[in-house]
């Protein structure tokens, strides 16, 4: 059984003991799907005799996999999240469920999936910037449901996202790159696309320059 901010596992077939561990301060475990993964790992760790402190320490040291809800930069209460591996709407739904006050960068080469699958999560989104081959179509599909602009490139979307946060005076927000599309319109693969986005942490001067305008 999974509860908010806690992992609680009932191992019915093995023991009557209810295992419980506090994960509220483990910020690298983002999203319910990662809590579920952690729950499975926790069961195995307890069965081989590891203590809660040892398990929690391992969770806290785990940085996650690249391009999967990867925190690449944090500026105060503004986070920059690389989810380039989310190449379909189903993967992106997990990202949207994991955050609030989202500036969402979306688009690439469409897999002909229905974007309306993501409509239930738009209340978490402040603004959408669409990019790539499918960008114009996505912007039209989202028009009237959320603030949205087609900006073509990932670089433009990044700059527009920073400007939007500044103009809107958002104190806490997430710039989420979760494209829900493949990368093949502009990049070799999702890894190359993710690495391009990850240049954010190497371009702090650009961020400060934009903020100073």
Role assignments for model-derived ranges:
Residues 48, 98-99, 164-172:
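Glycine-rich phosphate-binding loop signature in dinucleotide/nucleotide-binding domains
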Residues 65, 84-154, 182-190:
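Active-site beta-alpha connecting loops in nucleotide-dependent enzymes
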Residues 37, 41, 83, 104, ...:
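Residue-level signal for inorganic ion chemistry
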Residues 173-179:
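Conserved active-site loop/cleft motifs that coordinate metal ions or position small ligands
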Residues 180-207:
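Glycine/aspartate-rich loop-and-adjacent alpha/beta segment that forms the canonical ThDP
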Residues 1-80, 139, 147, 198, ...:
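Acidic, Mg2+-coordinating active-site environments of NTP-dependent enzymes
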Residues 119-120, 159-168:
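Short amphipathic alpha-helix with an adjacent loop that forms part of the alpha/beta core around
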Residues 78-79, 103, 174:
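Hydrophobic "anchor" residues on beta-strands that sit immediately upstream
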């Amino acid at each position: 059984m999974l509860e908010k901010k806690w992992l609680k596992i009932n191992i019915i077939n093995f023991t009557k003991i209810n295992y419980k561990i506090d994960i509220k301060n483990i910020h690298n475990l983002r999203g319910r799907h990662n809590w579920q993964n952690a729950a499975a790992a926790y069961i195995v760790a307890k069965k081989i005799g590891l203590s809660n402190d040892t398990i929690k320490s391992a969770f806290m040291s785990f940085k996650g996999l690249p391009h999967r809800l990867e925190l690449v930069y944090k500026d105060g209460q503004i986070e920059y999240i690389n989810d380039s591996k989310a190449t379909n709407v189903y993967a992106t739904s997990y990202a949207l469920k994991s955050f609030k006050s989202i500036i969402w960068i979306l688009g690439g080469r469409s897999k002909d999936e229905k974007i309306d699958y993501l409509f239930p999560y738009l209340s978490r989104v402040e603004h959408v910037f669409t990019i790539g081959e499918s960008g114009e179509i996505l912007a039209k599909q989202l028009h009237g449901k959320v603030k949205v602009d087609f900006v073509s490139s990932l670089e433009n979307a990044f700059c527009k996202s920073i400007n939007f946060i500044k103009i809107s005076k958002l104190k806490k927000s997430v710039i989420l790159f979760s494209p829900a599309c493949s990368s093949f319109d502009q990049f070799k693969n999702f890894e190359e696309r993710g690495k391009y986005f990850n240049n954010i942490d190497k371009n702090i001067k650009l961020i400060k320059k934009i903020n100073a305008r």
